[in-house]
Amino acid sequence: MKKQVPRLSMEEMTPALQESLRPRVERLGYLGEFFQCAAHQPQALMSFMSFTEDLKEALPDNLTEVVALSVATLMGNAYERVQHERLSLKLGFSRDWVREVISSPGDGHLMSAPELAVQKLALAIIERRGHNTADELEAVVESIGHERAIAVLMLIGRYVTHALMVNCLELAPQVGSPLV
């Protein structure tokens, strides 16, 4: 595919964006191609990153990873799915749990009731474009409370946005899946 969007190196990015990305690059060991593209809008990218971090603070890791893995899988975003497979393992989740999240949407024996409710909501929102999801939302509110339910809704939107960009740009994972 022709790359319509030039990829920026760290050195080509604004100093503020370089500083913002440095910890992530050090943690991952590489500068992700998503960031190389999105860096053409440095302030928006930094806001996107801040939005992501705020939502990660609002939710426990297991729910964040359920949303990230579920949305990435349903949206066909291998780029993000592989990153979150790796992150989930680093956070201490088992390979079997990660496999269940990505292969058994809305059903499983390793996921907790709140995790299943969150996954069902995420899948329903995407599949139904947000319509007719009151039952799934109610289950999440009953399970984790309305404040966290709002964080889940926002996180779903964040990962859908990422997937749409990655899929349009035809970005591929820069590392292999740790599950193979």
Range-by-range predicted roles:
Residues 1-180:
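Hydrophobic alpha-helical segments
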